[in-house]
């Protein structure tokens, strides 16, 4: 009898143990840890937020301070939320100095934060972040991870740093002044900047800013990322040393523009530019449209080509590289050209004076309707000049030649000391020479042996 009782007790114990070791799906109808829950967590006052982890975060910058988490209970238990100083930190629970990683989850935790006094947000996680109703004198946003950020509101001073792969969608965030730094592959979208825009672009991420009404745009581009701007700005200060392009053809510049290119990146400027200063030292090309400048200066020291269009009162050009200047669409009053390299220069509609000195192999093509042509040719480069002019003064000591078969001058003083030659049509009287309807007159041919005329 005692033996039978012992066997019965042993069988019951074994059955209980088997049940205890069965999978949870058989032991109970639902795992409490996988159930979806919502937690309200207490927070003290804060003005900054630091986010890390794969959470979907929604921030209301006009709501009273609050913190709500929604997700599976096990996930919520592994989220640390703490206020340190003035900063609310939301991140995975740390394990021995490392963040605890959940692994793959079926649902993403949603974190809702009320932050009425919000001034700064730092995003280092992979989750997406929404920030609504931003308002105040200043706001700082740092995107350091793969998570995307979308923000809306209005602020006077906006400071943005993008060093991660996440995109920053800020086109619904109005700002007066914007200071933007791009060091990573993430893209940034802006809109409606009404003050100053300062861009430091060193990464591969692109910037697109629409609807600008800026007083001044300053851009420093050192990486492969592109910058595309539209709207208007009174002033532009651009420096490029990377391979990224500056797409400013849809940005109307109403004041001064400065552009320096030292790399392969291309640039396009447009508007009603009142003053222009450009330098092209790299292989990137420059296009400037809509010039309405009193003065314009251009220095070309590299292989990059330049195209200018519009109107300039006084144009000063130095060409020392292999890049060509195409100013066929530019109307100028006075033009000064110094050619020291293989790059060629094309000018049109010079209305007053053309002062050109050619020392290199680059050629000069120009059309005149003005007072004077002052030309010095010391190299192998040729010059072809058309139109009408009152006075021609030329000195040719190199192998290059002056082709003036299409040029009519009232008076010509040409000296040739080298193997080059010169030709120009000469008529009597400065007044007649300045007329576009006057006959060509006599063709003056000059070489180092002397000069003679033909009909």
Label each PLM-derived region with a short phrase:
Residues 358, 377:
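Short Lys/Arg-rich basic patches
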């Amino acid at each position: 009898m005692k033996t039978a009782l012992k066997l019965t007790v042993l069988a019951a114990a074994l059955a209980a143990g088997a049940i205890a070791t069965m999978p949870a799906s058989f032991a109970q109808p639902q795992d409490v840890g996988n159930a979806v829950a919502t937690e309200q967590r207490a927070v003290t006052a804060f003005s900054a937020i630091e986010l890390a982890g794969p959470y979907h975060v929604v921030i209301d910058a006009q709501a009273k301070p609050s913190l709500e988490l929604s997700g599976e209970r096990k996930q919520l238990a592994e989220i640390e939320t703490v206020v340190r100083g003035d900063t609310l930190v939301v991140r995975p629970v740390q394990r021995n100095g490392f963040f605890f990683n959940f692994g793959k989850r079926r649902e993403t935790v949603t974190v809702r934060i009320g932050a009425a006094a919000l001034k700064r947000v730092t995003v280092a996680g992979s989750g997406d972040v929404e920030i609504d109703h931003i308002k105040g004198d200043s706001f700082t946003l740092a995107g350091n991870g793969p998570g995307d950020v979308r923000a809306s509101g209005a602020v006077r001073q906006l400071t943005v740093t993008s060093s991660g792969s996440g995109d920053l969608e800020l086109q619904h965030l109005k700002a007066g002044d914007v200071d933007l730094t791009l060091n990573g592959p993430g893209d940034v979208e802006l809109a409606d900047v009404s003050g100053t825009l300062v861009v430091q672009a060193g990464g591969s991420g692109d910037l697109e800013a629409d609807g600008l009404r800026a007083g001044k745009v300053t851009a420093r581009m050192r990486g492969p990322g592109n910058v595309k701007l539209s709207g208007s700005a009174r002033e532009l200060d651009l420096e490029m040393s990377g391979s990224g392009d500056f797409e400013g053809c849809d940005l109307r510049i109403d004041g001064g523009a400065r552009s320096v290119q030292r790399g392969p990146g291309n640039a396009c400027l447009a508007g009603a530019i009142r003053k222009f200063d450009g330098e092209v030292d790299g292989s990137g090309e420059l296009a400037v449209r809509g010039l309405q400048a009193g003065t314009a200066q251009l220095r070309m020291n590299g292989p990059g080509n330049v195209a200018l269009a519009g109107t300039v009162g006084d144009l000063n050009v130095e060409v020392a590289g292999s890049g060509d200047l195409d100013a066929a669409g530019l109307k100028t009053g006075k033009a000064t050209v110094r050619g020291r390299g293989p790059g060629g220069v094309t000018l049109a509609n010079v209305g007053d004076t053309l002062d050109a000195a050619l020392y290199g192999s680059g050629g000069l093509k120009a059309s005149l309707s003005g007072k004077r042509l002052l030309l010095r040719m010391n190299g192998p480069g040729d010059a072809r000049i058309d139109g009408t002019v009152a006075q021609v003064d030329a000195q040719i000591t190199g192998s290059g030649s002056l082709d003036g078969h299409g040029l009519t001058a009232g008076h010509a003083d040409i000296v040739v000391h080298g193997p080059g030659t010169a030709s120009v049509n000469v008529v009597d009287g400065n007044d007649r020479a300045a007329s576009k309807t006057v006959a060509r007159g006599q063709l003056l041919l000059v070489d180092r042996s002397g000069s003679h005329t033909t009909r």
